[in-house]
Amino acid sequence: MTDSQTETHLSLILSDTAFPLSSFSYSYGLESYLSHQQVRDVNAFFNFLPLSLNSVLHTNLPTVKAAWESPQQYSEIEDFFESTQTCTIAQKVSTMQGKSLLNIWTKSLSFFVTSTDVFKYLDEYERRVRSKKALGHFPVVWGVVCRALGLSLERTCYLFLLGHAKSICSAAVRLDVLTSFQYVSTLAHPQTESLLRDSSQLALNMQLEDTAQSWYTLDLWQGRHSLLYSRIFNS
């Protein structure tokens, strides 16, 4: 495990809005959700955000935790995660972001990490994804990469949720629902901080078998995204 200063340094890098995960291309169902509301305003967004975070907690965080705890089982964990996905759009987004993170690992991060068993598992995983023998789902890759970097499980879960919250808020700005100032105040708000902290704590006690969709209509909105007459995002 890395020391606290190094963990903080890596956390700031991983949570940077310029971190090249292509998150700006996805609204994670927000665009479709807003398009199906009678009133497309900030109140609709604030209804969406906590429900979306809770969905990610229950659909993704058990996999993040399992991948961090047992990186050598990345293939089995990925197969399980794939089997639980109920929305093809969400599946596509997950694999695209996972592949992006694997590229970041290979081209930017791996040079600064001492070779360990986790390092070897991750390199093997990357080769399998490149040869199309694995899918590279984002929560699996995230868990293994954070373990290779020496981040704690709690920090790994928190950063995953924070990244999702930032992506949703950023999408809301581009959709002209939030101003740039509201983007900052939303993320800095004590309720958002409490939601992220409490959710990451819940994730620590989750098992793969706890994976479930807590907000079923989110899958419907994401599934209808390609049917929107006009759209900015890919999901």
Swiss-Prot record:
GO terms for molecular function: nickel cation binding. One of its GO terms (biological process) is urea metabolic process. One of its GO terms (cellular component) is nucleolus. It holds the Pfam family UreF. Keywords: Chaperone, Cytoplasm, Nickel insertion, Nucleus. InterPro entries: UreF, UreF_sf. The keyword Chaperone applies. It is found in: Cytoplasm; Nucleus. Belongs to the UreF family. Probably facilitates nickel incorporation. This is Uncharacterized urease accessory protein UreF-like. The lineage of its organism: Eukaryota, Fungi, Dikarya, Ascomycota, Taphrinomycotina.
